[in-house]
From Swiss-Prot:
One of its GO terms (molecular function) is ATP binding. Serine/threonine kinase which acts as a negative regulator of Ras-related Rap2-mediated signal transduction to control neuronal structure and AMPA receptor trafficking. Required for normal synaptic density, dendrite complexity, as well as surface AMPA receptor expression in hippocampal neurons. Can activate the JNK and MAPK14/p38 pathways and mediates stimulation of the stress-activated protein kinase MAPK14/p38 MAPK downstream of the Raf/ERK pathway. Phosphorylates TANC1 upon stimulation by RAP2A, MBP and SMAD1. Isoform 4 can activate the JNK pathway. Involved in the regulation of actin cytoskeleton reorganization, cell-matrix adhesion, cell-cell adhesion and cell migration. PANTHER family: MISSHAPEN LIKE KINASE 1 (PTHR47096:SF1). Its EC number is 2.7.11.1. The gene is MINK1. PROSITE patterns: CNH (PS50219), PROTEIN_KINASE_ATP (PS00107), PROTEIN_KINASE_DOM (PS50011), PROTEIN_KINASE_ST (PS00108). This is Misshapen-like kinase 1. It comes from Homo sapiens (Human).
Length: 1332
């Protein structure tokens, strides 16, 4: 009945012997995709006849299949319902590339049945047309089946129509010839939706077989496709469809409008048992096929329909979005198509070409000889016919020449247009570059002008301050003379009345201020005026001040000599004692060009001022005693306030400035904002909890060295150490000790080490002089500002131990210079960046004090280093940690950046990024965080390190410790020991005064996390964001925007008036997945369309729709993209169900339904998917009751974890699958807790992760850690153990939301009242795993 077995005929085909198509056929355009290659519209070069050319690469794996297809076409294409095979050609490729096979077949110009259906109104053909097409398909199949050939891929795409409405079957790429004896196949090939159940069964059961009747099932599905526009289950993922087809009942027509004959025909074709399915001969006799109108009528009707649909298709193709995307995210985005198949490949073998040419010439010569003989015979028979034939050939040659000329002109026109476009694009780029250059020059000029203006202001301010200092000095001298006269009078009176000794001006508690002496009232008035001039912030926002203890209106005892010092000149007196203490010095490494004379500044002033007052316990009457601290009754000497201080004074009996021996220093109250930690250091014998205790006094030996150096310089000798070490002033009982008056420096204490195991930290001098009078964290007046001469200084007041710093800094690697003026932004931008009510108050007075001229110590424009050292180092005693010196360094460029407060106010930051301010910055009277907020972080082994933001950072020593040298301490503030108070660990870094706190080792950078933020303030709340390349797509309540992180921080609006709740970028697939809109639909946007909205370089793309929906789902609450091997799953949480979609690659290019789980017992709020041990799929979802799982295969739902100890509903935060557990173990985060369970609900660790507070967001980050964002802090924890690795305390309570993360960058947003938001990003340590 047929030919011999196919294996024998395959041997007859030698692919290498096929001719080259060059000069015979040429490709015109792509018209479709076949099983193994692309299909082109082609043209015969000589005759101009159109043909369909299938171009495929010849690989060793596919060579047999290609031979089989050629064999099928050659043998069975000579039928009216099968596309005619014209021939095959081989286009040779350069070595290393596969050769290309060109299969040339009959061209069907009307397209496929699928195209026809899509372009028909209602996506359905008329029943007569369907019957006609089905009959023609059956005739073609009958021809194949008669020769024991199964097509195996019958579908609308493989049924083509000619211009005359003839039906042709194409694509024999999967056809197979049946074995003569068995007659059945067991290979798994075909398109899923049209595939018969018995073909699918072959994949599951190796013993299963099928025969030619599988084509009948595919015909029935194609009939449904023509009636309904798509095959059944087309919304399902292909893999899911393969699973359902054998298990579901046979599909049926949805509409009732079809005739009984058509419905019966569908039912007959779609019988699941293929042995009961009728063959093609029987179906051709079926009433639906047999009883049709005349073929001529139907073909005319179908031809008209084809013409109409072609016009519609031409219009629709302009607006339909052509999707292009790579299958893998790692693939490069190359252009689709095979350009090499259209052009001749350069460098082809000349020998091969010559050989082929000779072959063709020989063949053409023989053909020409035959034609000539035929023509001579025909000419002899009919001369007129010969003349007609010649005329016809001539006419045809003329037409070919015209066509060739037209083609050349068209090509030249295209080239001209292309050149014009390129020239325009080049000109536009040039103009853009020139505009950018002009803008940069303009900005540079503005920056230079601003710099000059600031320099002039600094100079004027310096002169003003100098004049003011001179006036104050003169006024003080007069006051001192007046005071001396009054004291002489008092002494004379006391000599007359020796039994009656009263302190100077001991005010009663109810005494009227008007009764004070005239000099005191005058100084009080002068000080109040000075405060009003220099501290505008002190009165502008009274509402922001925190609670302060009440102050009595009057206090007994004299105001004392120090009280008379004006605010700009008031020194900070040291607190000496018989034991070892710490000294902090400001060490300028390079003098400023025009410094204010130090002799008239802070350091030398107290010696002259105090010299006029006697002290009875002083061994040398000419030298004043050191400042005493409050007495046992809690009295406070107001050292930095106005002379009419109304705090309690000392006892009348002892002199005003000497502390009695039997008095103990007052205890400092514990602040609620202080962070108690316990350090576990390798050098310590054990860890001791930090306590709020008094400062450690200085040793006698160090005191003697100090006096000896003063004596060598000829300075007046200060008094010896008192018997009892003076304690720190009570900052909470005296508000002036919490206030920094303008124009002088104050120091914040740093906690010393526990029992000498760590170098004791002294006091850090304030970074800047000119700051507004706002309360500081926990001021403790320290000996760091005592005036000490030095041989190495360039002006008075230089510390004596400057050599220590020199030795320290010689070992350090040089830092790269940073340009101070590279970063410019207006003061308005700086003020609006963090806190309007706090930053917008730094008026001209404060700004001018920030300038170099406003610094009373003249220590500007120099490498300013804050050194905290141990006094015992001078005597050669080495502390346990090597040198024991902690250095906080700034380069000259950084110092200049700090001084230019009208710039960003921050160092090392471009315009794009503006970091948040320091924890204590501009916090006028701000109350500290509540006890419950900070108490949670006080016992977790943390050390606070300053950060460049409104977040105060606490870091575990073991997590972010850089591996530096052994003689430097990893972070610059240490905790523990007696003699300190816990809340002294506060760096008072004011606006624009950011101190680089990197350890002084040779590492290029610090691995301590830092937080910065973008200046752009979004008007509506930021709900989500995703990184697209380096840039950030930001979704808000009102639209989608792109934040350009690579340029100047510009924000591009992409989509407006649409709410974006969640988003993810899949760059390899050219997709942005979102939950967006009022109805919370799952929409997919094409990245190329979004890109064009920014660049506007492709006008064709603008006409196309740039997004589509996934399914018809509304009310999506959450989704998750899960990548497993090469499959991308999309799990979606709806109101009462969970949908699972999967990405379908070519030719579908979309997410398609995979599984649906409806009627769940709990509403899913959070959803995820895991693949257990690489085999079992499970959906994990969180609800208000707990966490649950659904087995994907069986659909069974069960509870994983229900927190029974919580009676009310819970808020699930995150489902985190632990690494290296094969998807079996996870951390479930809810409320302020987290538990470790496996996918079967068994607790795997007796650890309950406990957050310090209720987080608003929880996220797993790349460093194998989890982060929790709360209103008071950001916590970083280990995902394996829940151990707290670090904390960032907020300056104020605020609502934060995690956005996205990549590598060592974590992005989150803050939401303020009124809905405005800003984007922050945190840079983690660089050792995090790069697994993006």
């Amino acid at each position: 009945m047929g030919d011999p077995a196919p294996a024998r005929s395959l041997d007859d085909i030698d692919l290498s012997a096929l001719r080259d198509p060059a000069g015979i056929f040429e490709l015109v355009e792509v018209v479709g995709n076949g099983t193994y290659g692309q299909v082109y519209k082609g043209r015969h070069v000589k005759t101009g006849q159109l043909a369909a050319i299938k171009v495929m690469d010849v690989t060793e794996d596919e060579e047999e299949e290609i031979k089989q297809e050629i064999n099928m076409l050659k043998k069975y294409s000579h039928h009216r319902n099968i596309a005619t095979y014209y021939g095959a050609f081989i286009k040779k490729s350069p070595p290393g590339n596969d050769d290309q096979l060109w299969l040339v077949m009959e061209f069907c110009g009307a397209g496929s049945v699928t195209d026809l259906v899509k372009n028909t109104k209602g996506n359905a053909l008329k029943e007569d047309c369907i019957a006609y097409i089905c009959r023609e398909i059956l005739r073609g199949l009958a021809h194949l089946h008669a020769h024991k050939v199964i097509h195996r891929d019958i579908k609308g795409q493989n049924v083509l129509l000619t211009e005359n409405a003839e039906v042709k079957l194409v694509d024999f790429g999967v056809s197979a010839q049946l074995d003569r004896t068995v007659g059945r196949r067991n290979t798994f090939i075909g398109t899923p939706y049209w595939m018969a159940p018995e073909v699918i069964a072959c994949d599951e059961n190796p013993d299963a077989t099928y025969d030619y009747r599988s084509d009948i099932w595919s015909l029935g599905i194609t009939a449904i496709e023509m009636a309904e526009g798509a095959p059944p289950l087309c919304d399902m993922h292909p893999m899911r469809a393969l699973f359902l087809i054998p298990r579901n009942p046979p599909p049926r027509l949805k509409s009732k409008k079809w005739s009984k004959k058509f419905i019966d025909f569908i039912d007959t074709c779609l019988i699941k048992t293929y042995l009961s399915r009728p063959p093609t001969e029987q179906l051709l006799k079926f009433p639906f096929i047999r009883d049709q109108p005349t073929e001529r009528q139907v073909r005319i009707q179908l031809k008209d329909h084809i013409d109409r649909s072609r016009k519609k298709r031409g219009e629709k193709e302009e607006t339909e979005y052509e999707y292009s995307g790579s299958e893998e995210e790692d693939d490069s985005h190359g252009e689709e198509g095979e350009p090499s198949s259209i052009m001749n490949v350069p460098g082809e073998s000349t020998l091969r070409r010559e050989f082929l040419r000779l072959q063709q010439e020989n063949k053409s010569n023989s053909e020409a000889l035959k034609q000539q003989q035929q023509l001579q015979q025909q000419q002899q028979r009919d001369p007129e016919a010969h003349i007609k034939h010649l005329l016809h050939q001539r006419q045809r040659r003329i037409e070919e020449q015209k066509e060739e000329r037209r083609r050349v002109e068209e090509q030249q026109r295209r080239e001209r247009e292309q050149r014009k476009l390129q020239e325009k694009e080049q000109q536009r780029r040039l103009e853009d570059m020139q505009a950018l250059r002009r803008e940069e020059e303009r900005r540079q000029a503005e920056r230079e002008q601003e710099y000059k203006r600031k320099q002039l202001e600094e100079q004027r301010q310096s002169e003003r301050l100098q004049r003011q200092l001179q006036q104050e000095h003169a006024y003080l001298k007069s006051l001192q003379q007046q005071q001396q006269q009054q004291q002489l009078q008092k002494q004379q009176q006391q000599q007359l009345l020796p039994g009656d000794r009263k302190p100077l001006y001991h005010y009663g508690r109810g005494m009227n201020p008007a009764d004070k002496p005239a000099w005191a009232r005058e100084v009080e008035e002068r000080t109040r005026m000075n405060k009003q001039q220099n501290s505008p912030l002190a009165k502008s926002k009274p509402g922001s001040t925190g609670p302060e203890p009440p102050i009595p209106q009057a206090s007994p005892g004299p105001p004392g000599p120090l009280s008379q010092t004006p605010p700009m000149q008031r020194p900070v007196e040291p607190q000496e004692g018989p034991h070892k203490s710490l000294v902090a010095h400001r060490v300028p490494l390079k003098p400023y060009a025009a410094p204010v004379p130090r002799s008239q500044s802070l350091q030398d002033q107290p010696t002259r001022n105090l010299a006029a007052f006697p002290a009875s316990h002083d061994p040398d009457p000419a030298i004043p005693a050191p400042t005493a601290t409050p007495s046992a009754r809690g009295a406070v000497i107001r050292q930095n306030s106005d002379p009419t201080s109304e705090g309690p004074g000392p006892s009348p009996n002892p002199p005003a400035w000497v502390r009695p021996d039997n008095e103990a220093p007052p205890k400092v109250p514990q602040r609620t904002s202080s962070i108690a930690t316990a350090l576990n250091t390798s050098g310590a014998g054990g860890s001791r909890p930090a306590q709020a205790v008094r400062a450690r006094p200085r040793s006698n030996s160090a005191w003697q060295i100090y006096l000896q150096r003063r004596a060598e310089r000829g300075t007046p000798k200060p008094p010896g150490p008192p018997a009892q070490p003076p304690g720190p002033p009570n900052a909470s009982s005296n508000p002036d000790l919490r206030r920094s008056d303008p124009g002088w420096e104050r120091s914040d204490s740093v906690l010393p080490a526990s029992h000498g195991h760590l170098p004791q930290a002294g006091s850090l001098e304030r970074n800047r002089v000119g700051v507004s009078s706002k309360p500081d964290s926990s001021p403790v007046l320290s000996p760091g500002n005592k005036a000490k001469p030095d041989d190495h200084r360039s002006r008075p007041g230089r510390p004596a131990d400057f050599v220590l710093l020199k030795e320290r800094t010689l070992d350090e690697a040089p830092r790269p210079p940073k340009k101070a003026m590279d970063y410019s932004s207006s003061s308005e931008e700086v003020e609006s960046s963090e806190d309007d009510e706090e930053e917008g108050e730094g008026g001209p007075a404060e700004g001018s004090r920030d300038t170099p001229g406003g610094r009373s110590d003249g220590d500007t424009d120099s490498v300013s280093t804050m050194v905290v050292h141990d006094v015992e180092e001078i005597t050669g005693t080495q502390p346990p940690y090597g040198g024991g010196t902690m250095v906080v360094q700034r380069t000259p460029e950084e110092e200049r950046n700090l001084l230019h407060a009208d710039s960003n106010g921050y160092t090392n930051l471009p315009d794009v990024v503006q970091p948040s301010h320091s924890p204590t910055e501009n916090s006028k009277g701000q109350s500290p965080p509540s006890k419950d907020g900070s108490g949670d972080y006080q016992s977790r082994g943390l050390v606070k390190a300053p950060g460049k933001s409104s977040f105060t950072m606490f870091v575990d020593l073991g997590i972010y410790q850089p591996g530096g040298s052994g003689d430097s301490i990893p972070i610059t503030a240490l905790v523990g020991g007696e003699g300190t108070r816990l809340d002294q660990l506060q760096y008072d870094v004011r606006k624009g005064s950011v101190v680089n706190v990197n350890p002084t080792n040779t590492r290029a950078h610090s691995e301590t996390p830092e937080i910065r933020k973008y200046k752009k303030r979004f008007n509506s709340e930021i709900l989500c964001a995703a990184l697209w390349g380096v840039n950030l797509l930001v979704g808000t309540e009102n639209g989608l925007m792109l934040l350009d992180r690579s340029g100047q921080g510009k924000v591009y609006g992409l989509i407006g008036r649409r709410r974006f709740q969640q988003m993810d970028v899949l760059e390899g697939l050219n997709l942005l997945i979102t939950i967006s809109g009022k109805r919370n639909k799952l929409r997919v946007y094409y990245l190329s369309w979004l890109r064009n909205k920014i660049l506007h370089n492709d006008p064709e793309v603008e006409k196309k729709q740039g997004w589509t929906t996934v399914g018809d789902m509304e009310g999506c609450g959450h989704y998750r993209v899960v990548k497993y091997e090469r499959i991308k799953f999309l799990v979606i949480a709806l109101k009462s169900s969970v949908e699972v979609y999967a990405w379908a690659p070519k030719p579908y290019h979309k997410f398609m339904a995979f599984k649906s789980f409806a009627d769940l017992p709990h509403r899913p709020l959070l959803v995820d998917l895991t693949v257990e041990e690489g085999q079992r799929l499970k959906v994990i979802y969180g609800s208000s009751a707990g966490f649950h799982a659904v087995d994907v295969d069986s659909g069974n739902s069960y509870d994983i974890y229900i927190p029974v100890h919580i009676q009310s509903q819970i808020t699930p935060h995150a489902i985190i699958f632990l690494p290296n557990t094969d998807g079996m173990e996870m951390l479930l985060c809810y409320e302020d807790e987290g538990v470790y369970v496996n996918t079967y609900g068994r607790i795997i660790k007796d650890v309950v992760l406990q957050w310090g507070e209720m987080p608003t967001s929880v996220a797993y980050i790349c460093s194998n850690q989890i982060m929790g964002w709360g209103e008071k802090a950001i916590e970083i924890r280990s995902v394996e153990t829940g151990h707290l690795d670090g904390v960032f305390m907020h300056k104020r309570a605020q609502r934060l939301k995690f956005l996205c993360e990549r590598n060592d960058k974590v992005f989150f947003a803050s939401v303020r009242s009124g809905g405005s938001s800003q984007v922050y990003f945190m840079t983690l340590n660089r050792n995090c795993i790069m697994n993006w």
